[in-house]
Amino acid sequence: MSDYKSTLNLPETGFPMRGDLAKREPGMLARWTDDDLYGIIRAAKKGKKTFILHDGPPYANGSIHIGHSVNKILKDIIVKSKGLSGYDSPYVPGWDCHGLPIELKVEQEYGKPGEKFTAAEFRAKCREYAATQVDGQRKDFIRLGVLGDWSHPYLTMDFKTEANIIRALGKIIGNGHLHKGAKPVHWCVDCRSALAEAEVEYYDKTSPSIDVAFQAVDQDALKAKFAVSNVNGPISLVIWTTTPWTLPANRAISIAPDFDYVLVQIDGQAVILAKDLVESVMQRIGVTDYTILGTVKGAELELLRFTHPFMGFDVPAILGDHVTLDAGTGAVHTAPGHGPDDYVIGQKYGLETANPVGPDGTYLPGTYPTLDGVNVFKANDIVVALLQEKGALLHVEKMQHSYPCCWRHKTPIIFRATPQWFVSMDQKGLRAQSLKEIKGVQWIPDWGQARIESMVANRPDWCISRQRTWGVPMSLFVHKDTEELHPRTLELMEEVAKRVEVDGIQAWWDLDAKEILGDEADQYVKVPDTLDVWFDSGSTHSSVVDVRPEFAGHAADMYLEGSDQHRGWFMSSLMISTAMKGKAPYRQVLTHGFTVDGQGRKMSKSIGNTVSPQDVMNKLGADILRLWVASTDYTGEMAVSDEILKRAADSYRRIRNTARFLLANLNGFDPAKDMVKPEEMVVLDRWAVGCAKAAQEDILKAYEAYDFHEVVQRLMRFCSVEMGSFYLDIIKDRQYTAKADSVARRSCQTALYHIAEALVRWMAPILSFTADEVWGYLPGEREKYVFTGEWYEGLFGLADSEAMNDAFWDELLKVRGEVNKVIEQARADKKVGGSLEAAVTLYAEPELAAKLTALGDELRFVLLTSGATVADYNDAPADAQQSEVLKGLKVALSKAEGEKCPRCWHYTQDVGKVAEHAEICGRCVSNVAGDGEKRKFA
């Protein structure tokens, strides 16, 4: 028997079947770095329209976690897809380098500033620590396949950036948004510092819930208000609170002007309560026998005075819109030094902003004899005992409620009034302008808009001062006596900024005021405060984007971070940009959800359900991680587990196998010489290119809308359904058995070439390593890297006017599916071994029959059978299978007649008819020794 294997065009490629990504990717990365791939892309894109995705800086502390990976991969997918869409999209990664977490790390190792080290040496240690953290994180980000200017990232501790942060503050001061005040701010007693809104987390805490009676100073005035004369015992206004420790700072009781308040007689005293809450209060304090004596509106009680239960002074009843009927008594204990609402109403009524608590969370000397020096969280029981002793406690119980805690220490925080610097939301219309700017931004997903709007509408003034060592100095001088800013503040800040640009922030602490103030130095003091670290990152639109040459003065198009950044970076950036320039710093804001495990639980080291990106890359490769990110709908929580990553690896194999099939069958194809013109191609091949064209339209639209899971789904459908289970199956016969240089084969290779050119580009933003690998095996002249080009423009399809148009082939796909079902059943019944052992008769109604007949002898190639005939639907025998999908089709199967050709494996009756090639069929003889078979349709 002759060996006809050498006459076949078997697939061949050096592109490996297995990805071995964990082993291969580092080598590719080394090549990207050696070649300066990022620089090559920048040169290729020079002069194109820009798209700037501004990197929100991660904090330079600790290893990257899975959330970091999601964030950087999403950014990279966008930047690369924008590049392929014809944009110049530079990406400059950044890091947030100042602030408390770094200070705490350095303190752990070296002690607090001023102990073993001077403050200057401490700052140098912080700078050193941050730099090592940046290096560690940078390696991991690069390993993810993220392309950017890693050699020149921006760091908020770069001297120039530090100087520009000071300049940003100067601009805000110049625009009139800064003011000083003793306002209550979130205060962590462990950090001994004010906290930003975004540094506060909420946890359940158990606190005493108490009802306290404040006795009326003028009992007769109250009786007159309620129009009653007989009251048994003293009259009190009752407040309810879960923070007894704040009572020493009480300066008023807030009531609602429009609520009804009633005077209620209970045993031996009368109490004033909101009418709607009487029942719940009586139940709570265990009173069943009570009488309502009279009713008034809250407004009637304004400025009546009540005695503080133990502080020895009296306080007014005041009117406030923040009073609700959700819980309590309808009268709210008001301590302007311990709460933002209390502070605002206190300002309105000119109340003292009392702050009896020191930075360490203990009461200051002179507060109250039994409280001085006591930690506020240990004081609740002392205060409750005091109230009991004074006869003012109506009720106490333990209550679990959500309480603000420090994000770093996880310990409860307090509101504490301290002298601080604030960016005012309203004195120059910052709130109103910010709300207006929000409307001009595209928020993705769109619920982000309502979220940030409500935050901006309700937020207090922004406390931007911190009492820390490692941070950008506020660089202000205030008058010793008046505490007013120096009249030349803006000029002086610029002078400081110039020095910081040369020597870093230490220049401020080394500065002798005389150097820039001259004779005035004796009248002014340097403000020791540093800026809130959120001011550092929030001003990068000015300190980085406005000054980096690659951005050429263009504003950022997009900010992209986790959904917690509405109150973090998106907010601080919006505030600073609007305060500086009157406009938002971004055009689009995209947020992604948090990562959770396969059961939807939050990632936690204590549960042991964290997924380390480093482990995933070392085991499966970065492309698998990238594919998981892209295939997950990032608008909600993003589930990740070993099982989920395994599914991503399965999808990856499908895509890789498709790419490998294309490359293997392009063996020996030179696009410059072998390309077949569209009009001369086999119809099915043109259909396949048209499928790629339709897929490309969907994929590009999805990239444009940032719907990457749609990109992956469409890519998978193309590889698995349109190519894998239909086209690539059908063409194997023609590809392998036709004459090597025949139009039949070259037509097929032309289609595969166009498809491969398109596919490699669709993959590139997501499967960057694999796309680069595929690119290296594609035939024809090309640039060195897929990332420097644009989407493939060589695709074409079938015209709707053609008889065998897309609709024709869509129907053929269905027919093929129905025939496959019958073949599978026959295989299960052991009637045939494989589909080529079968011959089928398709009993079809006239319209479908005409389409099937049009394919002539080539119908069998579409169906992958050795024989295929078409007959009238009404002539179908009883054993023909009725199609479930196509009502006008029945399929009958029989064993193919004739012998199996050892070359093409088809069963045919002309095997051995040609003496010189006695073992093979007539079609194969033509392909081996004759002019080759002609194919028109399939």
From Swiss-Prot:
Enzyme Commission code: 6.1.1.5
PANTHER family listed in its UniProt record: ISOLEUCINE--TRNA LIGASE, MITOCHONDRIAL, SOLEUCYL-TRNA SYNTHETASE
GO cellular component, as recorded: cytosol
One Pfam short name: zf-FPG_IleRS
Domain of life: Bacteria
Coiled coil regions in record: none
Function: Catalyzes the attachment of isoleucine to tRNA(Ile). As IleRS can inadvertently accommodate and process structurally similar amino acids such as valine, to avoid such errors it has two additional distinct tRNA(Ile)-dependent editing activities. One activity is designated as 'pretransfer' editing and involves the hydrolysis of activated Val-AMP. The other activity is designated 'posttransfer' editing and involves deacylation of mischarged Val-tRNA(Ile).
Principal location: cytoplasm
Binding site for L-isoleucyl-5'-AMP: E561
Protein name in the entry: Isoleucine--tRNA ligase
Top-level taxonomy: Bacteria, Pseudomonadati, Pseudomonadota, Gammaproteobacteria, Enterobacterales
Residues bound to Zn(2+): C901, C904, C921, C924
Localization, UniProt: Cytoplasm
Sequence motif 'HIGH' region, residues: 58-68
Signal sequence, start to end: none
